[in-house]
């Protein structure tokens, strides 16, 4: 059984911003927290509708995208 995508973009939710699946929390909020030096636990405390598994999946996908970009450069 495949896991649902950790994020979606729906024009009806936050004008199509990429959000964690099943929430109205934009993935950019996680990136903002991390760039500010905040911990993942802080993000999860502030956005309880997002699961740790969703955060992990987004970070894995972001890491894979960076590696793929580096290989193609």
Tell me the role of every PLM-derived stretch.
Residues 2-41:
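A short, structured beta-strand/loop element
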Residues 25-73:
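Long, charge-rich, low-complexity alpha-helical segments
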